[in-house]
A protein has these predicted regions:
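Extended, low-polarity transmembrane helix blocks
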Residues: 1-37, 53-65, 69, 76-136
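Perimembrane loop-to-helix junctions flanking transmembrane segments
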Residues: 39-55
């Protein structure tokens, strides 16, 4: 593959990684701005499921921080493999929660996130425009 095509593919990977990072970051920031409101909303959403309230509450306080950290790492391209793994695990937890709620529309959206985390993980060798690459 010629250098120009390789650079174009690496740039496309960067844009996808950056977009996922911004998405995760803004989700985290939005929830952290009113964490108690998010906590109460989550408790209400899971009130008819088998999950105990303390577990829902604990999750609602942890998820925004996880989203924020994963987002920052993806934006910077720092510890990208680990950030992608954590992001995929977070999405798995969210899919589980959506399944318990029988919220198939939200689960469909989360499955799309899962596919993007897979693509970014599978094609990690294209992660040229990143702090990880500068650290090599």
């Amino acid at each position: 593959m010629n250098d120009s095509k390789q650079t174009t593919i690496q740039l496309a990977y960067f844009i996808l990684r950056l977009t996922m990072g911004v998405n995760m970051f803004t989700n985290g920031v939005a929830r952290l701005l009113d964490l108690e409101k998010f906590n109460m909303w989550m408790i209400g959403q899971f009130s008819d499921t088998i999950l105990p309230e303390f577990l829902v509450s604990l999750s609602s306080y942890m998820i925004p921080f996880a989203e924020l950290i994963i987002g920052v790492l993806l934006i910077l391209g720092l510890f990208t493999s680990r950030a992608l793994l954590l992001g995929a695990l977070l999405i798995t937890v969210l899919v589980f929660g959506s399944g318990l709620q029988e919220n198939w529309n939200v689960m469909s959206s989360q499955m799309i996130y899962s596919v993007f985390f897979f693509i970014l993980s599978y094609m990690i060798e294209l992660n040229k425009f990143s702090l990880d690459n500068l650290r090599k």
